[in-house]
Amino acid sequence: MHAPVLVLSDSLKRESGSKVHHGNIQASKAVADIIRTTLGPRSMLKMLLDAGGGIVVTNDGNAILRELDVAHPAAKSMIELSRTQDEEVGDGTTSVIVLAGEMLHVAEAFLEKNYHPTVICRAYIKALEDSIAVLDKIAMSIDINDRSQVLGLVKSCIGTKFTSQFGDLIADLAIDATTTVGVDLGQGLREVDIKKYIKVEKVPGGQFEDSEVLKGVMFNKDVVAPGKMKRKIVNPRIILLDCPLEYKKGENQTNAELVREEDWEVLLKLEEEYIENICVQILKFKPDLVITEKGLSDLACHYFSKAGVSAIRRLRKTDNNRIAKACGAVIVNRPDELQESDIGTGAGLFEVKKIGDDFFSFIVDCKEPKACTVLLRGPSKDFINEVERNLQDAMSVARNIIKNPKLVPGGGATELTVSATLKQKSATIEGIEKWPYEAAAIAFEAIPRTLAQNCGVNVIRTMTALQGKHANGENAWTGIDGNTGAIADMKESKIWDSYNVKAQTFKTAIEAACMLLRIDDIVSGIKKKQAPGSGPSKPTIETEGDADNEQILPD
């Protein structure tokens, strides 16, 4: 007998075959079960304690999973799913996990019957293509200029969130903000950059009803010399700079030998003249407000206040970009390059207000702002954080609608229609792929079933009634009213989903399920390469062949 050959080192742990499939599916199901109860308007909240002892109370799928620390690699990739969904379309983070978990769950039976994973994946991909075709068939277009329709959609998105009691207000805020920053690219395309140009400023205190969308920008800064500079300017001329207004330090150290006392004064005078020069270049454009991202010396401050110009220093780059978009200014890198066209004249009002203990600067009433700020008020920090998460989702939905103005029914109606259509289609599929295809069709029912569970109605009775209504492929708009658990027409109840979100949910869930099914080996315990400077490494002995050519000394 030959001695067994060890290929992998002892420290490596290797699992393969059915054990891996089973482990992956169990891990994915566990993740899906954690957030299953947060789907729909009657969803539960989760309270998470982080390492620092802070508390997060939320029902946003992505926010919950982000806080979790999981060990299993498959569970990690499931969590990555909701993050992708959040970045792509901003909503549907819970649905995508529930759907992917269900897809894997129904695949388990086939793996036990020794179906090859590739066969299951092929059937799943076919089911995905057909489900997107069904979406295209039942989608209806809306007019994005009709505010009431867009409002209905955004409201049905927020209806599932913690702040649903303030649905109208958040929906209004989201639509106002996204329509403000929308830019027409021509050919019917619109670009809406939520991350860059919409800032959410959270200020605890006051009532939630005090929240508003500012047609402009606000930031947590005061003018440099509050006593001497104006804190309120109507129709200000604004100059934005990206350079320091203080004496430039030398790049490398220089020594100057001072022989007489006057030499010292000459040096100081040079510094003063340098700053005065910069200020004169700026002041000849008669600005009312100068904002710089870098420092501003006391001397420059003196010249500005003497000329009646307000100044703000050390502003964040992102805020500066927003101000530029809002008032039409151009950020300038050197004062001597300033032109009349760089000055922002689009703002109607600059003022500094005290909210709570902090001073905030407002540049508002802009004529055609392409950036805006959502000011959120509320009783506590936790409350405002949750409102912000919901607002981000609502803005994403509004953005999706502006980009692709198509709706599909909500309340699980879309999934039931897809499921019914795929079941009918599975009869025409030949060969072994028929069964996994049919299973995928059944898996789509996980969403309406979860909705019914969270409402507390009789799940079996409700699902049977719904399946009966959808079996003939008609009335695609029949679904569950998430608040009452009753079966209703989604068109009448105005429960809608964005086409983009649904399509992305299906694609992400099924592709992820296929990816996890294809994994048949998990090797753990692979050594990390030591990072530079992270600790003593063993001395390496170079032979002459290894040594770099430069290190070989000439004979």
Curated annotation (Swiss-Prot):
**PROSITE patterns xref list:** TCP1_1, TCP1_2, TCP1_3
What domain of life is recorded for the organism?
A: Eukaryota
Q: What happens when the protein's gene is inactivated?
A: Embryonic lethal.
| Localization (cell) | Cytoplasm
- GO terms, molecular function: ATP binding; ATP hydrolysis activity; ATP-dependent protein folding chaperone; unfolded protein binding
- Keywords carried by this UniProt record: ATP-binding, Chaperone, Cytoplasm, Nucleotide-binding
Name any one Pfam family assigned in the record: Cpn60_TCP1
GO CC terms: chaperonin-containing T-complex; plastid
UniProt key word Cytoplasm: yes
| CDD domains per record | TCP1_gamma
- Kinase is among the record's keywords: no
**Description of how the protein assembles with itself and partners:** Heterooligomeric complex of about 850 to 900 kDa that forms two stacked rings, 12 to 16 nm in diameter. Interacts with CCT8.
The family annotation for this protein states: Belongs to the TCP-1 chaperonin family.
The protein's role, per its UniProt record: Molecular chaperone; assists the folding of proteins upon ATP hydrolysis. Known to play a role, in vitro, in the folding of actin and tubulin.
Q: What is this protein called?
A: T-complex protein 1 subunit gamma
Species, as recorded: Arabidopsis thaliana (Mouse-ear cress)
Q: Which gene encodes it?
A: CCT3
